[in-house]
Amino acid sequence: MLRGGRRGQLGWHSWAAGPGSLLAWLILASAGAAPCPDACCPHGSSGLRCTRDGALDSLHHLPGAENLTELYIENQQHLQHLELRDLRGLGELRNLTIVKSGLRFVAPDAFHFTPRLSRLNLSFNALESLSWKTVQGLSLQELVLSGNPLHCSCALRWLQRWEEEGLGGVPEQKLQCHGQGPLAHMPNASCGVPTLKVQVPNASVDVGDDVLLRCQVEGRGLEQAGWILTELEQSATVMKSGGLPSLGLTLANVTSDLNRKNVTCWAENDVGRAEVSVQVNVSFPASVQLHTAVEMHHWCIPFSVDGQPAPSLRWLFNGSVLNETSFIFTEFLEPAANETVRHGCLRLNQPTHVNNGNYTLLAANPFGQASASIMAAFMDNPFEFNPEDPIPVSFSPVDTNSTSGDPVEKKDETPFGVSVAVGLAVFACLFLSTLLLVLNKCGRRNKFGINRPAVLAPEDGLAMSLHFMTLGGSSLSPTEGKGSGLQGHIIENPQYFSDACVHHIKRRDIVLKWELGEGAFGKVFLAECHNLLPEQDKMLVAVKALKEASESARQDFQREAELLTMLQHQHIVRFFGVCTEGRPLLMVFEYMRHGDLNRFLRSHGPDAKLLAGGEDVAPGPLGLGQLLAVASQVAAGMVYLAGLHFVHRDLATRNCLVGQGLVVKIGDFGMSRDIYSTDYYRVGGRTMLPIRWMPPESILYRKFTTESDVWSFGVVLWEIFTYGKQPWYQLSNTEAIDCITQGRELERPRACPPEVYAIMRGCWQREPQQRHSIKDVHARLQALAQAPPVYLDVLG
């Protein structure tokens, strides 16, 4: 509240009427208006200064509080208490200064609504103590308490510890206890947090049993104690009993989900908080699940096993014991936190038809066993006969000069050599006929209805930003790439395009189902395509429809189709062909059911529930092994592009797609610049640059090479290990440009081992020639994926 408001002036109550009045004050202040005559006046763009003597007795109902980042208060002797309600609306507050005032008490929860507070100055007030709870949860860079009549007691032990550890600038203040000497010399032998001991059953319990836990609390000045039951509601019926110093907890009718769940007892006193966690072992029989084999780096037969104790595993192949080798072996993925279920793969390195058959996984523990079987086919039999059958032998006619007097019998009327010659002649005729048909088809005037130009103009928002790299890379002059900051003049190379024959699909074979999204080029649909592959009558595909029918758009469409036809790799999204019958023109791609990698990472990260908005989320974050597998697959696709001398220019997780079995492929359908518009920085009219993924030479000189792609891949690695966060998310585009060009690097993500961060930093060398090659990066990631490092997130 305010004291001593004046009448007849633009006082506190008048400019508190609304944000428009506050804006007027800010404009006047910036224009050099006369000094503010009231108790609190605007300071800077988002600050407030309250310095008139005795004008405040609380901070309740500060005007424009929701936008304040700095609050300075001085000479307010009537301001004696700081409580929760005083700072309720100051969610953006960073700096708070209350000096030379009458402040005597700060409530333990006073700063609950100011989580961004980083600097707190309460010097020269009347504070005798300050609870550790007051600063709990704040990331304070500076805490100033000098000039207060502090009373030395165990309640200030936390502040003494800050002084010992050099936190918050406390050591420089050399705090004094009123009449008792320096705070650093305060005796603290008896100042300890509570001591906890939780009694758990010695033996494991069975599903359906009841478990009684007891928490014994010891220590001085006990204030509160209790149980943390967040993870337990679905695992048992919970009943609490007792109170300090002995707390009881009954878990009735326990389920197998209780395994690996933390049961935590906590207690607090004026010194601090203590917690002790225990786990209860619930025994249950083994269970197993097998899934269809998927092709990743190697082939993988995914499985999930559960049981307590952990079951032993054994594989059978066609009913016989499968002996594991370096080519066929069991690999477990990183276990999810607080779960007994283990996920893994039976890895098969380059399996052939010999490995086709029935695979059975047996799992057993002392309480039971389980098995599951699945048929796997990795390759068709290349032989037309059974290799185990005897090979037929043709006998030559018996020599008439034989000494034997037996009659001679000829096996065939037609000599074998004549049969071979006739067969070869027929084969040659068929081959030449087929070749002539293909040449005639590809040599005719193309089905796009346009003639190919010798030099192609800059593209405008193609689905995949993949470009042929001319000698030494490519760069954009200021007049180039008006349609997109990522495109330059692409010179057609006969080595890559002269023999390209784009597959044409009949429109009647495409049945659109529903719209997946829309980009600058047009719309993308989920469709059902018939007669696309010989082994399937119909299959789901993604269809991109061209919005414009202009000549330049059709040329871009043709060039993109030819380019995509040339790209055939297991980690590049597969392009099936085009449909040019009628309008609009269509491109047909492989359908990746899980969408783009960025959304997939966010929905499988630690913040998935926060981002889901009530929808179902994945059971837990991706583990280290899975993150490494994702990164290695993206690197494999980039190795392939680099081998063809293609520069991507827009490599990011938003431009990668995820399919069944955690298969990741490079490529998008041109929607990323619309869906992820905040990832691009607009330069001029239409140019959009992904500056947060670009190296200094690309930002400053528009130079794009395979080395600039390596830099971008390092940023993609950072995205993967932050579960899809935007690089430099805390900075504006211009601030991010400054950081990149000045040599600053993204910080190591919490989920990232040092070995992976070393790879990132190798990708971010300022000199392009000093960066790792993408081939070397891929090899290192593959090695880490096969043997993930042991990494503990001590902060998580």
Swiss-Prot record:
Disease involvement: Congenital insensitivity to pain with anhidrosis: Characterized by a congenital insensitivity to pain, anhidrosis (absence of sweating), absence of reaction to noxious stimuli, self-mutilating behavior, and intellectual disability. This rare autosomal recessive disorder is also known as congenital sensory neuropathy with anhidrosis or hereditary sensory and autonomic neuropathy type IV or familial dysautonomia type II.
GO molecular function list: ATP binding; GPI-linked ephrin receptor activity; identical protein binding; kinase binding; nerve growth factor binding; nerve growth factor receptor activity; neurotrophin binding; neurotrophin p75 receptor binding
Catalytic reactions on record: L-tyrosyl-[protein] + ATP = O-phospho-L-tyrosyl-[protein] + ADP + H(+)
Localization per Swiss-Prot or TrEMBL: Cell membrane; Early endosome membrane; Late endosome membrane; Recycling endosome membrane
Keyword rRNA-binding: no
Protein kinase domain sequence ranges: 510-781
PANTHER family linked to this entry: HIGH AFFINITY NERVE GROWTH FACTOR RECEPTOR (PTHR24416:SF370), TYROSINE-PROTEIN KINASE RECEPTOR (PTHR24416)
Protein name: High affinity nerve growth factor receptor
Substitution effect: A107V: In an ovarian serous carcinoma sample; somatic mutation
Note: Trk also stands for tropomyosin-related kinase since it was first isolated as an oncogenic protein which was the result of a fusion between the tropomyosin gene TPM3 and NTRK1.
Annotated disulfide bonds: C36-C41, C40-C50, C154-C191, C215-C265, C300-C345
Tissue/organ expression: Isoform TrkA-I is found in most non-neuronal tissues. Isoform TrkA-II is primarily expressed in neuronal cells. TrkA-III is specifically expressed by pluripotent neural stem and neural crest progenitors.
Regulation: The pro-survival signaling effect of NTRK1 in neurons requires its endocytosis into signaling early endosomes and its retrograde axonal transport. This is regulated by different proteins including CFL1, RAC1 and SORT1. NTF3 is unable to induce this signaling probably due to the lability of the NTF3-NTRK1 complex in endosomes. SH2D1A inhibits the autophosphorylation of the receptor, and alters the recruitment and activation of downstream effectors and signaling cascades. Regulated by NGFR.
Signal peptide as annotated in the record: 1-32
GO cellular component terms given for this protein: axon; cell surface; dendrite; early endosome; early endosome membrane; endosome membrane; late endosome; late endosome membrane
Lineage: Eukaryota, Metazoa, Chordata, Craniata, Vertebrata
Ligand binding (ATP): L516, G517, E518, G519, A520, F521, G522, K523, V524, K544
Site residues by UniProt (Breakpoint for translocation to form TRK-T1): L486
Function: Receptor tyrosine kinase involved in the development and the maturation of the central and peripheral nervous systems through regulation of proliferation, differentiation and survival of sympathetic and nervous neurons. High affinity receptor for NGF which is its primary ligand. Can also bind and be activated by NTF3/neurotrophin-3. However, NTF3 only supports axonal extension through NTRK1 but has no effect on neuron survival. Upon dimeric NGF ligand-binding, undergoes homodimerization, autophosphorylation and activation.
